[in-house]
Amino acid sequence: MAARSVDSRGLFREATKAVLGSWPVLQIAVENGFGGSHSQEKAEWMVGAIDQYFSSNADLEQYEVEDSIMGMMNDEFDTIVEDGSQALVAQQLCVLFSQCRQGETAAVQAKIAQLAQKKYDVRAKVQEVTPSDDEEESSDDEEEAMDCENTPGSSSAASLSGALGPSSAPKKEEEPEDDGWTVVRRKKK
């Protein structure tokens, strides 16, 4: 009986490694070093920590496992999982632990093989986007238009138009709408 317990615990550890190894969120965190220079070691530590969590707590519920995984991801990788995949990972771990406890080694080994085939090759690519000169100028114009307000009795918009020169002054007068808003039209180039 003790040999079977050790064997099922080793099998569950292997199953945990397969589940976490096929989880894209953890793979992205490791590949991009979200956990620092020791990201791979932290992922391996998670396997042992989850194995220990299951063996030291009887009758874990899926939400408890999910909370534990979320805590590990947040603490070790500074990652908050928002895609809902942690629920699937927790469910798989609970099912595999139950199967290991009941001695269903063939089913667990089949799941491990399935997860090994399904392992994702996920790499997040970071692209730097530099706006062109035209885009920078147009965004500056938009900011200028947003900075000034034209309220009745206020001369700040008129003084701003005069300070910018006649070429930048709007040709049409701003028209107040029925609901009290003022429509500001963008100048054309």
UniProtKB/Swiss-Prot annotation:
Composition skew (Acidic residues), residue ranges = 131-147
Residue ranges of region Disordered? 126-189
What superkingdom does the record give?
A: Eukaryota
Q: One GO term of the cellular component aspect?
A: nucleus
Q: Does the keyword Ribonucleoprotein apply?
A: no
Comp. bias (Low complexity): 152-169
What the entry lists under InterPro entries is as follows: Pre-rRNA_process_TSR2
Which GO annotations describe the biological process of this protein? maturation of SSU-rRNA from tricistronic rRNA transcript (SSU-rRNA, 5.8S rRNA, LSU-rRNA)
Identify its protein family.
Belongs to the TSR2 family.
Function as written in the Swiss-Prot or TrEMBL entry: May be involved in 20S pre-rRNA processing.
Q: What is this protein called?
A: Pre-rRNA-processing protein TSR2 homolog
What organism is this sequence from?
Answer: Xenopus laevis
What gene does this protein come from?
tsr2
